[in-house]
Amino acid sequence: MVEFYINGQQVEVQLEDEQTVGDVLKSFESTCEENDAAVIGIAVDSKQITAELFDEEAAKPLGSNTKFEFSIVTKNDIKASFEKLSALFNELAAQMEGVPVALQSGKNAEVSESIKRLADSIEQFCHVATLASLFPDTFSTGSLNGISFKDFFAEFSPILKDFEDALQNNDTVMLGDLSEYEICPRLKEISKALQSM
C-alpha cells in the first residue's frame, strides 16, 4: 500500500492513474497549489529527493509499497509566522529601549540575552522570508520605507556588530546610544512592516 505523510502526519490519499513517482509528485504539487501551499521537502522511501535527484527519481515506476513524505508550508503558516515575528520584534524594541537603564543597574547578562534573542529573531525572519518567496503574488511587498528587507538588514548588520563590540568593551555610553537611537527604531519599523504582510 502506498503511504503518504505530510509534515510527519500520515494522510489518506486516493491515487488515480499515476504510474510513476513523478506522476504522484506532479499531482501532489497541483493539489498544494490549489490549497495555497508549497512543497519544501520530499522523501521517497526515506530517501531525500534533491533537485539533482529529482528527474531520476521521478522516472521510477510507482511501487505498491512506496512511501512519500512531504514537507509543506502554507500561506497561512507564513502569515502567522510574520505576525509572531512582528510581536517579537516589538517586544525586543521595548527591551532595547531599556538597555541604558539595565546597564546602569549592572544587568549586562540581561542585555547580552536580549542581543542573542535579537540575532535569533533576525535569523528566523530570514528563514520565513525565504519561504514567503514561494508565494510572490502574496508576499511581494517586502520592504521597509521603500528599502528592501535585504538592504535593510545589510545596513542593520554593522550596527549590531558595533553593539556587540561596545558590549565586549563595556562601553555603556555607546551601548545606550546604539540601542535607543539605532536598534530600537529599526525593530519598530520591522514590526510595523510585518503587521501589514
Predicted regions and their residues:
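Intrinsically disordered, low-complexity acidic/proline-rich regions
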Residues: M1-F4
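Short, contiguous acidic and Ser/Thr-rich linear segments
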Residues: I6-G22, K79-F82
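Long amphipathic alpha-helical segments with strong coiled-coil/leucine-zipper propensity
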Residues: E33-S140
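Amphipathic alpha-helical coiled-coil segments and their boundaries
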Residues: I78, V111, G142-N145, F149, ...
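Intrinsic, low-complexity N-terminal interaction/targeting segments
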Residues: S133-A154
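Alpha-helical oligomerization segments
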Residues: A154-M197
